[in-house]
Amino acid sequence: MIHPTGALVYEKETLYSHLDVIDNGNIRTLYLDGNIHSQMYKDKPEELVNTYTKYFHLGFLFNPNAKDVLFVGGGGFSGPKNFLSMYSDVRIDVVEIDPDVISAARDYFNLPVDNDGSRIMIYNDDARNFLSKTEKKYDLIILDAFSKNYVPFHLMTLEYFQLLDKKLTSDGVIISNIIGSMTGDRSNIVRAVYETISQVFPSVYVFTTEHNSGNLQNIMLAAMKSPTVEYSKDELRQLASNNDNNNHNSSTALDDLDYLEHLYEAELKTNDVPLLTDQFAPVEILINPVTNEPYNFENVPTKGSTGLSWIEDTNSIKLVLLTLIAAVWIFYTQKEWKRNQKKMSL
């Protein structure tokens, strides 16, 4: 079947989203509710297609001896597959809430079978529920469960980060992916998460994935459990050099990113954003400036081409339908109210 962005390989309405697997040349893409979630080279399924996923390796910059890794959010399992291919001594757990996403990854994205003898274990569960039950501690936890249009609020609150802190080893690291900007109201969600995570972890670094920090993009946060001095850019470069001398694969993975030039060193003001808690986490308001902005994901046609127009058209149709539903509801509510008023007057 021909799809606006390529050939439709598979689709399903899951309990959590509408899932599409689309082929466009050598790139296979997982869409959730019309938004790109993961991409894969069909001829090299372990390689990372999207730049932001390469920043997952920052965890090994700060903790080069990491062995036990947890991914929160599976999708197409790009990060876990890449880690398995690059780090022979790493053990990976992945927690993904949607069983149909896991099935699609196995069937269409070369996800290895997990069993007692494999280095990857997959858990179909809500992340907080899983973390509350497990007694395991991790050297590195990667948070990749957010999208441009949806952020599960309970995965970015103070209580959640406190739970993560308990599940980290003494040198543990958190790498979190957030879509936003470093300037304007599109930075609100980034700054609120930064403010919240900083209450728990003593050192938090911010990396942009584009040179223009004002663009809407993937913003990567790196948070350390152990109290450390704040590394400067030069000190981080030396840290990377030390890892390189020790033949650690993370240096190779990060080489082509020029990632140190993306270290955000300006002061990040948080006095106008809330501390996110289980009792108060207005994430829908915070991400509203982000959801209303077109987001140019890599390796897909950009806005204005035939590629993403179906997504924007779908959003417009949804808005029209919601408006019509609201109008009909108001009409019948008023009609029912008038009928009740007449009955009361008789």
Tell where the protein language model's regions lie, with residue ranges.
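Soluble small-group transferase modules, centered on the S-adenosyl donor enzyme superfamily
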Residues: 1-39, 203-337
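Acidic/histidine-rich, surface-exposed loop or edge segments in extracytoplasmic proteins
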Residues: 34-42, 174-178
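C-terminal substrate-binding/active-site "lid" region of AdoMet-derived donor-dependent transferases
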Residues: 165-229
